[in-house]
Every structure is written in C-alpha cells, then in structure tokens.
Amino acid sequence: MGRFIFLSSGLLVVFLSLSGADFECPSEWRPFDQHCYRAFDEPKRSADAEKFCSEQGNSGHLVSIQSKEEADFVAQLISDNIKSSPDYVWMGLWNQRREQYCSRKWTDGSNVIYKNVAERFTKNCFGLEKETEYRTWLNILCGDDYPFVCKFPPRC
C-alpha cells in the first residue's frame, strides 16, 4: 500500500508539472501567461515593427500589456535583450481618431484593460519609456525608429 501511495503521488507531481507546459515558444522567444514574447533591438518605425511582428507567424503583433505582472515581465525582457538602451521601445498601443473622439486600442484588437500611461503628449503611438525602466507608456511620434517587442499566442 505504501508503494502505491508513493508511486501515485510521484505520478501526480509529474502530471501537474507537465500540465502547465501545454505550449512551447520558438527558440529565442520567451513564454509568459500563454503567449510568446521577443524583444528586437532593430529600430523600426511603429507600423514597420507591427508588420514585422505579424510576419513572425501565428497572429503576432506588437506587445499588448494586460496586467502589472505582464508589464513587469516585458520590462525585464527589454532589459535582458535590448542592449542599445533606447529612450523608448515600441508597444502595440495606438490612439485611433474617429471623427470627434479618440480611443486607444491594441494592435492585436484586444481592449485596453490595464493602463500605465504618462499623459504628456498627444501623439498617435505609444512606447515604453526608459526613464521609468520601460514600465510607463508614453505618446511618441509613430515615424521615429525604436526597438520593439512582439507577442503572439503559441501553437498548441
């Protein structure tokens, strides 16, 4: 009976450890909360960075940030992988002007739930600001070249 309990609990540990790993990210991409992420230290304009992310496959976009935990993960990813130490890093948040109002939308189509915006300027694109260790979002000119972070849901 003792061996059965020991074997059963051992199998349970193996099962539980594997159950959280139901997806894999490609080489050089990092997993977090059911998505794959990669920081690119190749400065591009916002629209070009978004196009590049979409070409990475599987519905890729510039990063959308939905929680403080994800913001912390992305900030660490930038620190670990973008060595040029730029003032800003592109993210997938844009102001969308529609007639008399302006709304913010992620390039992946998701709604803006978590916000950490510094309201200093009124540009159309957003970047993560170096001054705040890439945790605050700032309006910046879409035509400037900056490194960027891509995100996509993995293939299961």
Swiss-Prot record:
Q: Describe its assembly.
A: Heterodimer; disulfide-linked.
Instruction: Name the tissues where it is expressed.
Output: Expressed by the venom gland.
Q: Which family does it belong to?
A: Belongs to the snaclec family.
Alphabetical UniProt keywords: Disulfide bond, Hemostasis impairing toxin, Secreted, Signal, Toxin
Q: Which InterPro entries match?
A: C-type_lectin-like, C-type_lectin-like/link_sf, C-type_lectin/snaclec_domain, CTDL_fold
A GO term, aspect molecular function: toxin activity
Q: Where in the cell is it found?
A: Secreted
Disulfide connectivity? C25-C36, C53-C150, C125-C142
Q: Specify where it is mainly localized.
A: secreted
**What Pfam families does this protein map onto?**
Lectin_C
What's its job?
Interferes with one step of hemostasis (modulation of platelet aggregation, or coagulation cascade, for example).
Q: Which SMART domains match?
A: CLECT
Name by which UniProt lists this protein: Snaclec 2
Q: What Gene Ontology cellular-component terms does the record carry?
A: extracellular region
Stretch forming the signal peptide:
1-21
Q: Which residues does the UniProt record annotate as the domain C-type lectin?
A: 32-151
Tree of life domain: Eukaryota
Q: What is the lineage of its organism?
A: Eukaryota, Metazoa, Chordata, Craniata, Vertebrata
Which species expresses this protein natively?
Answer: Bitis gabonica (Gaboon adder)
